[in-house]
Every structure is written in C-alpha cells, then in structure tokens.
C-alpha cells in the first residue's frame, strides 16, 4: 500500500504555514518516511541536520518494525490506564516482534511489578538495561533507574 505523509509547521498566532513537506512511499517504509519528512522540515527551517550519533539514538528509541511499535504503544496506553494485565500481554507481544527494543522490556518490567511478580520484573529490567546502549542519555537513565530500583527492592 502506498501512503503519503504531509507535515506542516504553522505559526498558530498568525495562522501562517512556516514550512511543509510531503513524502510518498510504501506503508512498510513508514519510519523512513518520517525520517525523510523530518530532514525536509529541518532543511526548510534552517535547522542543523541530525548527526550520525543522534540518528543512532533516534533509531534506538523506536522499535524496529511497525507491529512492535503498535504493540508497545498500546501496552504503554494500558499501563497508563492502570490495566497492568492487558499491558503485560501487549508488551510480551511487542518483545516477540522486536526482542532487542530496550523500552519494551522496561515497560514490561513495570507491568510485572504492578502485578506483584518482582522476580519477573527484575529480569525484564535487567534485559532492558543490557539493551540500552544506543538509547538517548535520558532514556538510559530511566532504564537504569528502573533496574536499580527493582534490584534494590528484591
């Protein structure tokens, strides 16, 4: 399926469009389309391009495929709604779809913890910590904090 992604930056007080960009591609390439749109907007706005180090960090902050991203975001939504049981199931599926995505493991650790399974929470927190190398410094701190917190409680 072909899709078109239109992104527009507007000055809301004046109602003027400052910059816009449109990219077209296949649904399977959605993440690449988002990256292309971001690059196009940066160029039009005169903002510096993303460095190779930043690009690695951005890619690490997202699951490697759409299905894993969907399941991860739905799992987070269930966690926020205090439905740890549904979150656990969705996050386990997200991990099956992308075993190397640190933040899915970290979120599953939170779900296990809320369900009272501290050993399972500890294992997922450890896994998240081991996979966190390419995350942004802020995300690394969150993952490390969760791991240290659950490790100290057990």
Each model region followed by its residue ranges:
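Acidic, proline/glycine-rich low-complexity intrinsically disordered segments
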Residues: 1-154
């Amino acid at each position: 399926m072909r899709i078109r992604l239109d992104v527009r930056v507007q000055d809301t007080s004046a109602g003027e469009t400052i910059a816009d960009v449109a990219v077209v591609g296949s649904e399977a390439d959605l993440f690449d389309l988002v990256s292309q749109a971001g690059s196009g907007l940066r160029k039009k706005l005169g903002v510096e391009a993303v460095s190779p180090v930043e690009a690695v960090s951005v890619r690490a902050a997202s699951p490697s495929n759409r299905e894993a991203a969907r399941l991860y975001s739905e799992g987070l939504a269930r966690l926020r709604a205090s439905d740890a049981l549904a979150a656990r199931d969705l996050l386990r599926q997200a991990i099956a779809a992308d075993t190397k995505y640190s933040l899915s493991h970290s979120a599953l650790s939170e779900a296990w913890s809320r369900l009272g399974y501290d050993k399972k929470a500890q294992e997922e927190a450890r896994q998240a910590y081991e996979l966190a190398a390419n995350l942004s410094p802020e995300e690394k701190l969150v993952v490390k904090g969760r791991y240290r917190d659950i490790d100290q409680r057990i």
